[in-house]
Design a protein with these regions (language model features):
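Helix-loop-helix hairpins and the membrane-proximal interhelical loops
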Residues: 1-49, 166-167, 208-305, 449-450
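Helix-loop-helix junctions within the multi-pass membrane cores of secondary transporters/permeases
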Residues: 2-36, 57, 78-87, 91-139, ...
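Hydrophobic/aromatic residues within the transmembrane alpha-helices of Major Facilitator Superfamily
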Residues: 23-30, 60-63, 67, 144, ...
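Membrane-embedded alpha-helical modules
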Residues: 93-213, 347-455
Length: 455
């Protein structure tokens, strides 16, 4: 039955491989169930309701991904988009969270229309092959950066980022939590790399679990001491089961009356959500598909329409349930690295999101320094694509360099793509190669430039 549904043999995979990939993807992104309520509740939304809405919307989106495209991508509430929702729309602009949810709903519906009319597919295919490679490499750099941040190997400093100091940690009392977490993360990275070299199946998942277990042992021995003020909690689950929170406080909470009286301002908010959602999704899909060799010889992804439609439907459903924009997660690459090639990986991740509603005390105990090693190693694997960039052709190579570096520097996939597009187009025009740029590329470049003055 599973063979008929997901064409496993045709895609060179097995049920076991897909299940391991789905579990690995889930474990690397389960943090969103803790982080999304923390961010969105700043706007006044009920945290418990947000957690339930996020889990259910994520599961539905993952199931849609499997049904519409048979691809191994997982979806959940997008980071950056939830911060924009809470801190910009509801914070700086001062709009009620019901208005922000309405904007997400409208954005999702527009997204569905764009997907059904092949607009997003045209955008995907308009991106030059070299930039697609750069996007994959840039995402690798980006998620590795997220990994070292999550483990607090890199911390804020006078130079914007700096290395965690064990000496300072011992002096100020943070070593027993933050310092131990850094060491355990490093052990996790080394463990995953060794298992990768040895060809161990499920090395990402085993690396995460090993790091977590070592952390539990350290806590039992008094080496690791929880420090909630720094975000370091007990690694030992206090419970295994809990009943899901009601979504009633956020379900279908829209404010269409406000939209009618503030149409222009509302349109700007919708455009911001739509812009970031479209290009974050495209960037993630390009990066993950490129890593898994899913792109054809022309750099196009078969069944891209289904992938994009699943993302759009997920956003719409998420808004109805009461969460911010649902988008394809870059952590999907961890499952793909484990061999995930079909929608069975997505289904597995989706089921685990539903299970997490009842096992949230267990899943939420896994610390970020245990999942960080997986992100760092996946970043390394994705950056291997850098050899496919034509470095001898500066007109193509420099925009790729800009795209790669700006993803990390701007802490945004879509911003990296924007800088890559703009530099690619301008350099080709100035060097007399304007005819190599498609009309759609010119239009998108113009929109990227306009975006910097609107959002």
């Amino acid at each position: 039955m599973l063979e008929k549904l997901f064409h496993l043999k045709e895609n060179g995979t097995t049920v076991k491989t897909e299940l391991i990939a789905g579990v690995t993807t889930f474990i690397t992104m389960v943090y969103i169930l803790a982080l999304n309520p923390s961010i969105l509740s700043v706007s006044g939304m009920d945290a418990g309701s947000i957690l339930t809405a996020t889990a259910v919307a994520s599961a539905i989106a993952c199931f849609c991904m499997a049904a519409f495209s048979n691809m191994p991508f997982a979806l959940s509430a997008g980071l950056g988009l939830n911060a924009y929702f809470a801190y910009t729309v509801c914070g700086v602009m001062g709009y009620p969270w019901q208005v922000a949810l309405t904007a997400v709903l409208v954005e999702g519906i527009i997204f569905i229309i764009m997907s059904l009319t092949s607009v997003r597919e045209a955008i995907f295919n308009a991106i030059p092959v070299q930039l697609k490679v750069a996007v994959s490499v840039g995402i690798g750099f980006f998620i590795a950066f997220i990994g070292v941040q999550n483990a607090h190997i890199i911390v804020d400093g006078a130079t914007l980022v700096s290395l965690y100091s064990f000496t300072s940690g011992i002096a100020n009392g943070t070593f027993s939590s933050q310092g131990v977490g850094v060491i355990l993360c490093m052990i996790g990275v080394i463990s995953i790399v060794i298992m990768l070299i040895k060809g161990v199946k499920g090395y990402m998942l085993w690396g995460i679990l090993l790091t977590w277990v070592l952390g539990i042992i350290c806590q039992l021995l008094g080496i690791y001491v929880p420090n909630p003020e720094l975000g370091y909690y007990s690694l030992i689950p206090t419970a295994f089961f809990s009943m899901p929170n009601s979504i009633a406080p956020t379900f279908f909470q829209f404010d269409f009356a406000f939209v009618a009286s503030h149409l222009a301002n509302f349109a700007v908010v919708v455009f911001a959500f739509l812009f970031v959602d479209v290009f974050d999704t495209l960037g993630t899909v390009i990066g993950c598909a490129s890593k898994a060799n899913m792109l054809d010889k022309d750099g196009k992804l078969p069944r891209i329409k289904g992938v994009l439609l699943a993302d759009a439907v997920g956003t719409t459903v998420g808004a109805i349930l009461g969460t911010s924009t649902i988008t394809t997660f870059v952590e999907s690459s961890s499952g793909i690295t484990e061999g995930g090639r079909t929608g069975l990986t997505s289904v597995t991740t989706g089921i685990l999101f539903l299970v997490a509603l009842f096992l949230s005390p267990l899943f939420l105990t896994i610390p970020s320094f245990a999942t960080a090693p997986a992100l760092i190693v996946v970043g390394f694997l994705m950056m291997q694509q850098v050899v496919n960039i034509e470095w001898n052709d500066i007109t193509k190579a420099f925009p790729c360099f800009v795209c790669i570096t700006m993803m990390g520097f701007a802490y945004s996939i879509s911003e990296g793509i924007a800088f890559g597009f703009i530099s690619y187009t301008f350099i080709h025009v100035i060097t007399g190669k304007a005819k190599e740029i498609s009309l759609l590329m010119y239009i998108l470049t113009g929109l990227f430039i306009l975006k910097f003055f609107i959002i």
